[in-house]
């Protein structure tokens, strides 16, 4: 009876890795954009963010891609592959206009369910307005805002 509870706690600990990695990537993307006016859109260039993180661990494999929110540039990072029983996650950084200037916002989204094929999780499809993205309501496959 205690084994399912233990496994659930173990998966929560593993999933916290994804949340921490994606939050770090989001912050790194914001800093990079502030300095270079561009985002890193390929996992091959993730070292340019200066985070010192790997693109894969025993729990998750991470990837990057470009997004468009309200017709403005953005980027997303997601857990492309995961261990069995682990939920997929996506982090997004996107530009919004505030007081006549562009600024960046972030979102961290969780999938409702464990992926059917944890070795090949599709990139999040991002549509809608910044407000929609902020609460993950238009990030296909990811519905829970963290």
Predicted regions and their residues:
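Amphipathic alpha-helical segments typified by the pilin-like N-terminal helix
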Residues: 1-34
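Periplasmic/extracellular, small/polar-rich flexible segments of pilin-like filament-forming proteins
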Residues: 34-146
